[in-house]
């Protein structure tokens, strides 16, 4: 029985022998461009189910993977994709760990390839590489959105320029700080923000400020900026922006170059208190503050031969409404109100009788009227004509109906016509218990 060879296996054996005998020393997996296309694998006549046919067809269906040449020859032609650029090992590891972050290797490659004469470009690249290494890169896109739902605290910073160029002679720093820094402390407590004065000219010692500015310390980097007020707020977004607006509105009041406003006047008064200036005396009747107040009265001269000042109270002179010593006091009449500050009258003499206040009518006063005494009939004759004229009227008839004549005769004894013949001063009050001629005689 004649044995037939497979053409595919024959081609594989011939290519293996040619590769092994390649004088260029190329890798066995690298093959040169063939002179004619390789024929397709054919199945054996036995249906491909035999072990011999399957073993011979497997090398053609599954060829070994092609690898990039380590050191290809000059005449070798590689079939496949273009070779990838060579990268440093550290950059390759970073690219494998973070495939999305390709910005840092590119910056480092550009910095290495850049000429050192480009100083500004080298400085900018160094700053950018440092930011990326610290993890501060590409955060600007994330900060464009405010998260109001989570209520996370945020920090706001604003720099308010002080108009020293427009008003170079005005001391804005002293007005904002205040005496011993008390003004800016109260301003921070009122607004709830951190406020500080920074920039060129913010320090009192100019020599020290210049020394710190040239020192290059990042803490004093603000000395290279213009004079400004730095406002810093920390809190939830809504509250932080509200506090910032309030703080900026209050700081704006201190940027007015006016030495006579309320802020400067309060600072002058506070400075006088801190320096130990005594406060104006506070006595009775002496006004301390306020515009338009009357000046204090001059001192009263003392000594013999000097008269009292106008409107002054002299000891021993009667005051309006007061009782003079030795004057007659009428019983039943309340004394006039006394003047505040006037000396009280003394009632130790025998001519003045002390009367209790307010006067109460005593029951013994009715005993002086003498109801048992008889009165003269002179006054009844005067009323007789009036009674006869009004008797016909119903009004007076009803009042007089059923009464006796004796009730009118009892009042007829009173001499009304001769009681007050003229307007004269009433007589002095008689001694208690004496007989009166008339019950109303004292009037």
From Swiss-Prot:
Keywords: Acetylation, Cell cycle, Cytoplasm, Isopeptide bond, Membrane, Methylation, mRNA processing, Nucleus, Phosphoprotein, RNA-binding, SH3-binding, Transcription, Transcription regulation, Ubl conjugation. It comes from the Eukaryota. Residues 434-443 have a biased composition (Basic and acidic residues). CDD domains: KH-I_KHDRBS1. Residues 100-260 are annotated as: Involved in homodimerization. The modification Dimethylated arginine is found at residues 320, 331, 340. Pfam families: KH-I_KHDC4-BBP (PF22675), Qua1 (PF16274), Sam68-YY (PF16568). The modification Asymmetric dimethylarginine is found at residues 45, 52, 304, 331. It is found in: Nucleus; Cytoplasm; Membrane. Residues 1-95, 280-317, 326-345, 411-443 are annotated as: Disordered. Residues 171-197 form the KH domain. The modification Phosphoserine is found at residues 18, 20, 29, 58, 113, 150, 390. Tyrosine phosphorylated by several non-receptor tyrosine kinases including LCK, FYN and JAK3. Also tyrosine phosphorylated by the non-receptor tyrosine kinase SRMS in an EGF-dependent manner. Phosphorylation by PTK6 negatively regulates its RNA binding ability. Phosphorylation by PTK6 at Tyr-440 dictates the nuclear localization of KHDRBS1. Acetylated. Positively correlates with ability to bind RNA. Deacetylated by HDAC6; this regulates alternative splicing by inhibiting the inclusion of CD44 alternate exons. Residues 61-72 have a biased composition (Pro residues). There is a cross-link at residues 96, 102, 139, 175, 432 (Glycyl lysine isopeptide (Lys-Gly) (interchain with G-Cter in SUMO2)). The modification Phosphothreonine is found at residues 33, 84, 183. Residues 81-95, 283-293, 307-316 have a biased composition (Low complexity). GO terms for cellular component: cytoplasm; Grb2-Sos complex; membrane; nucleoplasm; nucleus; protein-containing complex. The modification N6-acetyllysine is found at residues 21, 175. Self-associates to form homooligomers when bound to RNA, oligomerization appears to be limited when binding to proteins. Interacts with KHDRBS3/SLIM-2. Forms a trimeric complex in the nucleus consisting of BANP, HDAC6 and KHDRBS1/SAM68; HDAC6 keeps KHDRBS1 in a deacetylated state which inhibits the inclusion of CD44 alternate exons. The complex is disrupted by MAPK1/MAPK3-mediated phosphorylation of BANP which results in BANP export to the cytoplasm. This facilitates acetylation of KHDRBS1 and CD44 variant exon inclusion. The KH domain is required for binding to RNA. Belongs to the KHDRBS family. This is KH domain-containing, RNA-binding, signal transduction-associated protein 1. It comes from Rattus norvegicus (Rat). The lineage of its organism: Eukaryota, Metazoa, Chordata, Craniata, Vertebrata.
